[in-house]
Amino acid sequence: YKGVVAVHSEKTSYFTSSPSHSLSRPSVSEVVSVRDMIEFATDAEFKGTLHIAHISTKGALTLVKEAKKEGKIKVTSGATPHHALFNMEKENTYLKMNPPLRDEEDRAYIFSSLLSGDIDWVESDHAPHTKEDKEKGKCGIPGFKGTLLLLDALRENGMSEENLERIFNTNAAHAFGIDISPLPLPINTKEREEIAGNRYPFDPYAL
């Protein structure tokens, strides 16, 4: 098999009974899982691409960067808007997802790694729920507005339009062998952000 294997990396044996969602699924659960995935792919001499979806920790991303440098397997990673923009201090029932929000060091590292190109692409992780479901503890948030907010933030921090095009469009398309002619990324996003925020009965990015 020479295609893409995308993995959600959290090792459940490291989960705890903490009342905090972020602390109950600690960073180490992701780091150990990513380590194992890289080792499995390397030992199997995997010829495809191992993709680490919605990476959220500095430790896990460091392992991905080391594997890329070593060059024995092809490995990519993606990051979500919420893991790049919010830390666990913002955690509430509306900002609850898996993997959970991490501490500020992890968040800042994810954001800077998007800027540097060390993360291959942005993933919306779009998983909307009703307000009632969120108040019952369901995991997942709508990702459209967050994607626009992240686009703005990366632009404001000096990312070129060419590199934005890569991480929002072409890198993922190339990895999955999709031949597309992507639409230009929006420059004026404020109206779109308002529309996206109003599509749901609550806006987790405004809470």
Question: What name fits each language-model region?
Answer:
Residues Y1-V122:
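Histidine/acidic residue-rich metal-binding segments in metalloenzymes
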Residues K72-K74, S116-W121, N171, K190-R192, ...:
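Active-site lining segments that contact anionic ligands and/or coordinate catalytic metals
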Residues H83-A84, L95, F111, D152, ...:
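Broad hydrophobic/π-residue packing in well-ordered secondary structure
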Residues H21, R25-K47, S113-L185:
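His/Asp/Glu-enriched, well-ordered alpha-helical/loop segment
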Residues K11, P81, A127-P128, A206:
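A broadly conserved detector of short glycine/acidic/proline-rich loop/turn motifs that flank catalytic sites
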Residues C139, G146, P182-L207:
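C-terminal cap of metal-dependent C-N hydrolases
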Residues K11, F86-N87, D103, S160, ...:
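General structural signal for secondary-structure boundaries
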Residues Y1, H54-S56, P128-T130, E165-A175, ...:
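Short secondary-structure transition/capping segments
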